[in-house]
Amino acid sequence: MRRRKKRNNTIWWLVGILGLLTVLCLLALWTAAGMATSRVGEAVKPLVSIQRDGYILRKYPAHTVAATVVEGERYTRAMFRGFEVLNRYISGNNDQKKRIPMTAPVLQGMREKGGGFEIAFILPDDLEGSGGAPQPGDKRVWIDRRPPMFMAVRPFSGYATSEYAAEQIAILKDLLERDGIQTARPPAVAQFDPPW
């Protein structure tokens, strides 16, 4: 009888310890997820910003991106896959094994030729002064220096599903047509938070 009682106490003690460890692990994951999904620090700042009826015209300075193409996937899945590939690049999968700070926004647009989606991370400005961006360790990633450009921007909040993004893009296209503004590139969605 004593042996059985002692065994039951030991089992309850182990269950209590496992429960406490589970709670601590969940708390750690919750904290980490909060940090990982919070807005990232550096973002490309527009040089000029003109508010219009329903959108904003902005001129952005030249900037460098790490980009990849995801083919054969739908909009949301393409963002996840592209984000994973680019996240490995900034996490050290490059010739310098260098970790690169995450910046905002993450860009996703349809390619003009060849189909698929181009996903791009804007790289921090300080890489320019330190010899440029490290070369990717994955052949699916390339580095591209983009010239200064004007962009028509329609800010929206919420999760950028393919349907919601398409709706916002259609509204922006109508507004630009109304104002006689022609576009030079296919539209892109710029997200300031991770895609999960």
Q: What would you call each of these model-derived segments?
A:
Residues R2-W196:
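A solvent-exposed interaction/effector surface
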